[in-house]
Amino acid sequence: MRYSCPLPLYSVSIIAHLKHRQSLIKGLNNHLCQQHGNEIETSFADLGVSYSGLSGKTAADFGSGKPFITYLNVYSSNVIDETLYQYVQIGSKEKQNVVRYGDVLFTLSSETPEEVGIGSVYLGNQEVYLNSFCFGIHVTNTQKVFSPYISYYISTTQFRKFIYPFAQGSTRFNLCKSDFEKASFKLPSLENQKQIYESLKCFSDKVAVEETILKQYYSQKQYLLRQMFI
């Protein structure tokens, strides 16, 4: 007896649906930024205080200890994924910068200028550190910026165009951190930042739920396929 299984086609349909939703979120993010993004002029130097990642560490220090945020975690998500920490030994008298809620984190270098200064925002409350290939900004000026909104703003086309000129190099590109921090850019008003964030997060949460369902569906499909050939 031959078995027919429509699962792969359905799976492809779901993936296409999710990609479409993600594209819509990106487009909406850009549109709202263009519509409301000229209400506050500021800079990261005005918004907070910058700090470096881990220093003075050797390979022997990694693998256990305190959690730290990896380069890939910053690079791959607009909000730090708290399930992807790695670990490093931190001495009781050692001075290392701790990442705080609302901090904006950026990558310092990349092989292409387009990927320099990729950002992410930490929205957790755990004592956590930052890898040495990134830097962070403690946001202190909460009268001008709503940190959760920045997690969307830093992925807009407008912000990516703003950051490109600060990538310097030839074979490998590095972010000119001091110039980047002092450079002015424009944001929506604080109230609009909060409203835009709530709207975008609503869509993002729906996509996240659908991605979870897709993973569960894929596991179920694999189970059923195994049962067919027992």
Predicted regions mapped to residue ranges:
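A short beta-sheet element
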Residues: 70-71, 90-155
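Non-catalytic DNA-recognition/assembly elements of restriction-modification systems
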Residues: 23, 27, 31-55, 182, ...
